[in-house]
């Protein structure tokens, strides 16, 4: 069984939106979160989707599920105090749906330019290696800095990747790590791959497209709209 856990828990402070979290902003009559879920909905290998949502917007999210006929969404749950805790709540909900050896794909609700090919590659990688971290090769040189903002290391670009999403694992593995971490007071890991790395779990890269952006700022929003329009034009004009 393959389950998508889609995190839509942010409130969009960096987007400067008033009243509506960024994941609910609309592009061509459809909220960003729905654009994202649609990809999972239309991927044959995905059996179910869990959405983790801002608690005040649960009813709104449930209405979207019904309005856009998102039949693979089997649960909409409230997020936690941190991103990690929100994902944990989604994983717990997935556990209620899962069969043995379930694969979970943890994805950002504001990454709507994911595609079926990457989703399938994640599932394949988990079954072969136990993990999949969707990533892109660094286009520019990555540097590490010290506390004085001085460069302490220039990283070899040929070995540098940028981690994105989905980040995928066997559900039992990521839940085991999450529960142990929480029991030790670790509740604010930046993402699931970071947490698994803290536990020395082997992480495998799955290369994804550069356009798999996370919509965090107004610039990201307009970039998504431009890329979405370009995709639509390709289909219309047969480009």
From Swiss-Prot:
Annotated signal peptide: none
Swiss-Prot/TrEMBL site (Transition state stabilizer) positions: 14, 22
Pfam family, one: IspD
Reaction(s) this enzyme catalyzes, per UniProt: D-ribitol 5-phosphate + CTP + H(+) = CDP-L-ribitol + diphosphate
Family per record: Belongs to the IspD/TarI cytidylyltransferase family. TarI subfamily.
Main function: Catalyzes the transfer of the cytidylyl group of CTP to D-ribitol 5-phosphate.
Protein name: Ribitol-5-phosphate cytidylyltransferase
């Amino acid at each position: 069984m393959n389950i998508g856990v889609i995190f839509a828990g942010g409130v969009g402070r960096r987007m400067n939106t008033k009243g509506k979290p960024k994941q609910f902003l609309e592009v061509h009559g459809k909220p960003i979160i729905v654009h994202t879920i649609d990809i999972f909905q239309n991927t044959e290998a995905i059996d179910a989707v869990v959405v983790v949502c801002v608690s005040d917007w649960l009813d709104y999210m449930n209405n979207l599920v019904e309005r856009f006929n998102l039949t693979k969404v089997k649960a909409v749950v409230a997020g936690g105090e941190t991103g990690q805790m929100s994902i944990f709540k989604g994983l717990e909900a997935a556990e209620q749906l899962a069969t043995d050896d379930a694969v979970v794909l943890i994805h950002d609700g504001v990454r709507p330019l994911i595609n079926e090919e990457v989703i399938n590659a994640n599932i394949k990688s988990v079954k072969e290696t136990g993990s999949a971290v969707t990533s892109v090769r660094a286009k520019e040189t990555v540097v590490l800095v010290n506390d004085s903002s001085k460069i302490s290391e220039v990283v070899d670009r040929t070995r540098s990747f940028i981690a994105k999403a989905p980040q995928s694992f066997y559900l039992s593995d990521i839940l085991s790590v999450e529960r142990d971490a929480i029991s030790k007071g670790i509740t604010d890991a930046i993402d699931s791959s970071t947490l698994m790395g803290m536990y020395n779990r082997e992480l495998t890269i799955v290369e994804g497209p550069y356009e798999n952006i996370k919509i965090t700022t107004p610039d990201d929003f307009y970039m998504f709209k431009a890329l979405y329009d370009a995709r639509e034009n390709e289909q219309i004009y047969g480009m």
